[in-house]
């Protein structure tokens, strides 16, 4: 057990209400200029909890007026989801490999699914018909091997993989990881699918309720690269079906390399002359061109 975990375990034995940690996290995150990386560095990576950091910084800003307003807003959300505090009982072991682990994780469904054998199937939102077909077929084969599918529930490849689970007659399992608060829907046309994922298996988010509410719309896009990093941490391997040179999927590919998680690039994508990004990954440790799902199954069973 790491020194960081020993510190966190000691803190958890001597304090805290998870609810107070949630409020502290939400409030700290709502401050101007705050980010997941900054909060992760100041809390999880130093072995302290959000409430301790809030006490340290209390003299830097007032915590009465807007703290109460924030608390009322958070309270209105809590009946719709559950949450777990990093370092507390129930935090998924697999997520400790993340480069910037969130202090709090929001979820709907069975959090224990994170510890199952999981594979992300990711790719373009505006996917080709062939890409959609490949995503669906890959998911179907993984379901047949008792592997949980991880998806970002975006349009295109993500949706094709999710629908393979929905059409599996109850045999498949799915984890949806979203880049909005746990009770928001993006894209809106996937609302029914997202609710189905949450009710049947597991939906995850690390996006704070209050900051999301008050921040400018244009800054909300930053949550999606962080979502992809969380997907990499949740997954034992990632399969890229197709993606452009500017795709957000590349954030997940880079995270796989950092965490030592296997990354598979479908051959149709790797040999696509219209994109150059695969050449930056192919040949690096843990990266394979995917010809058959058996390669993925071998990698995650090793």
What would you call each of these model-derived segments?
Residues 1-19, 86-302:
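Glycine-biased, small-residue-rich flexible motifs in mid-sequence functional cores and linkers
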Residues 1-89:
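Short, small/acidic-rich helices and loops at N termini and domain boundaries
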């Amino acid at each position: 057990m790491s020194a960081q975990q020993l510190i966190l375990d000691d803190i958890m034995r001597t304090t805290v209400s998870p609810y107070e940690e949630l409020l502290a996290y939400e409030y700290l995150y709502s401050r101007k200029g705050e980010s997941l990386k900054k909060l992760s560095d100041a809390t999880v990576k130093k072995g302290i909890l959000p409430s301790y950091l809030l006490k340290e910084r209390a003299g830097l800003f007032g915590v009465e007026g807007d703290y109460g307003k924030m608390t009322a807003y958070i309270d209105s959300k809590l009946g719709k989801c559950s949450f777990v505090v990093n370092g507390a009982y129930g935090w998924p072991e697999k997520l400790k490999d993340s480069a910037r682990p969130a202090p709090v994780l929001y979820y709907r469904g069975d959090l224990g699914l994170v510890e199952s054998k999981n594979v992300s199937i990711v790719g373009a939102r505006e996917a080709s018909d062939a890409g959609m077909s490949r995503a669906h077929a890959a998911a179907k084969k993984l379901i047949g091997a008792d592997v949980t599918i991880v998806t970002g529930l975006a349009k295109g490849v993500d949706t094709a993989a999710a629908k393979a689970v929905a059409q599996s007659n109850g045999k498949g399992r799915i984890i949806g990881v979203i880049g909005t608060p746990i009770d928001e829907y993006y894209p809106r046309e996937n609302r029914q699918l997202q609710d189905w994922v949450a009710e049947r298996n597991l939906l995850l988010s690390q996006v704070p309720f209050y900051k999301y509410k008050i921040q400018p719309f244009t800054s909300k896009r930053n949550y999606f690269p962080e979502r992809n990093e969380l997907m990499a941490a949740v997954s034992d391997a990632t399969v890229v079906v197709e993606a452009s040179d500017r795709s957000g999927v590349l954030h997940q590919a880079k995270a796989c390399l950092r965490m030592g998680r296997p990354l598979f690039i479908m051959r149709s994508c790797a040999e696509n002359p219209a994109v150059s990004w695969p050449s930056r990954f192919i040949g690096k440790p843990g990266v394979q061109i995917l010809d058959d799902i058996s390669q993925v199954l071998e990698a995650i069973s090793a």
